[in-house]
Amino acid sequence: MPKMKTKKSASKRFTARPGGTIKRGQAFKRHILTKKTTKNKRHLRGTEGVHETNLKSVRAMMPYA
């Protein structure tokens, strides 16, 4: 049986943590930033974990992560 392929778009957006969770970047931080407050932009920095409702589908896209 051939090896499963990793979805390359998912591998660029998500990284697996040692504990089994998957981290992702924040949304709403690319453009139209002038109307957002400094506090709002500050809270959008960094990464978050993928929500448990989406975790199964993200893991299916990255079988070897």
From Swiss-Prot:
Keywords: Ribonucleoprotein, Ribosomal protein. Residues 1-26, 38-65 are annotated as: Disordered. GO terms for biological process: translation. It comes from the Bacteria. Residues 1-15 have a biased composition (Basic residues). The keyword Amino-acid biosynthesis does not apply. Pfam families: Ribosomal_L35p (PF01632). Residues 45-54 have a biased composition (Basic and acidic residues). The keyword Ribonucleoprotein applies. GO terms for cellular component: cytosolic large ribosomal subunit. GO terms for molecular function: structural constituent of ribosome. Belongs to the bacterial ribosomal protein bL35 family. HAMAP family: Ribosomal_bL35. PANTHER family: 54S RIBOSOMAL PROTEIN BL35M (PTHR33343), LARGE RIBOSOMAL SUBUNIT PROTEIN BL35M (PTHR33343:SF1). This is Large ribosomal subunit protein bL35. The lineage of its organism: Bacteria, Pseudomonadati, Pseudomonadota, Betaproteobacteria, Burkholderiales. The gene is rpmI.
